[in-house]
Amino acid sequence: MPASVWKDDAARLRLEHWYERFLARVPGPVERRQVPTRHGQSHVLVAGRADGPVVVALHPMRAGAAHLLSELGPLLAHCRVVAPDLPDQSVRGLQLRLPLADDALARWLLDVLDGLELRAVNLFGVSWGGFVARLTASTALERVRRLALLVPAGVANGSHVTGLMKMAVPMIRWRLRPSDANLRRVLDPLFTTWDREWSDYVAGTLRDMPMDMRIPPLASDDALRRLTMPVLVLGGAEDISFPGDAVVRRVTAMAPHADGELIPGCKHSPPATEEFREWLAARLRRFLE
C-alpha cells in the first residue's frame, strides 16, 4: 500500500537534512547504492572495513540507515556493514507500507540481499529492524548465518497501559507547549541517556512524520524454534516497550542455539555513548567469531 514517511514537502526536506546530518557522523567513507527489489529501487548504505565480515544491519522505526551507522562506529573498524533503509520507516526508504502479518518485509529484504549478491549473511536488527531481521531468519533460515537482535520488536510486548500513562500526557503537554523540558518528559521513558542531536531529531519526526500505530505481531513459538542458526538477543532491563527480561527469556527458551543478555539500566533506546558503542561492537564481534 502506498504511504509517505513525511507529512509534506517541507517535512521531507527537513527529514533529508537530518539523514545527511547523521550520515556525516559515520566514520570513514560510506557508499550509497540503489538495489532493485520487487517493490522498486531500495536505498542501501555500505560502510566499514572492506575486507571485514559482512553484517547486514536493520535500523529502528522512524529512523534510517544513516542513523544506525552513526551509532556503529567501533564496529565499522572491524566489519563491513550493509544498512538498507527500511520501507515506510526512513525518508530514504521505499514509500510503501508493507503488511506486518505475513512475510512481505522478509521477501523485500531477500530481494535486497539478492541485488547485492549476498547469499548467507550475518543479520543484526534493532527494535523494528529486529522484527524484520527475525522475520527474515524464520522465513529463509538458509540466508542467515548468524542473527543478532537488540531490543527487538515482535517477541514480547510491554503493557500498553503503562506506556500510555508514561507518554500520553507528556506528549499532549509537549504539543501544546513544545519546550525542551516537555520534550524531555516525552522521551525520558524511552531514552537511556540524553543526547541533544537524537532528541532534536525525534522532536522533528513528531512534527514531520505521520504516526504509524501498528505494532509488529509477536512471533509464534514455531517461528522462534525455526531459528536454528546461532542467535544473540540483547534486551533492555528497563525497556517498557519490549521488556528485556521477557524478550531474552522467550528467545533463549525457543531458539535452540540462542544466547541472551539483559543490559542493565537500558531503556528502549540504548545509551548514545561511546562507552556503549564500544561495548556493543565488542559483543557483536565475539558473537560473529
Predicted segment positions?
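Alpha/beta-hydrolase fold catalytic core
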Residues: 1-53, 78-79, 274, 281-289
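Conserved HGGG/HGGXW glycine-rich cap/lid loop of the alpha/beta-hydrolase fold
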Residues: 43-91
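Active-site loop/oxyanion-hole signature of alpha/beta-hydrolase fold enzymes
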Residues: 83-124
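Flexible "cap/lid" loop of the alpha/beta hydrolase fold
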Residues: 131-138, 145-174
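Conserved alpha/beta-hydrolase catalytic His-Asp/Glu region
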Residues: 158-163, 174-228
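Short beta-strand/loop motif that positions the catalytic acidic residue
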Residues: 227, 233-235
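Acidic catalytic loop of the alpha/beta-hydrolase fold
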Residues: 238-242, 269
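Catalytic active-site module of serine/aspartate enzymes centered on a nucleophile-bearing elbow/loop
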Residues: 257-289
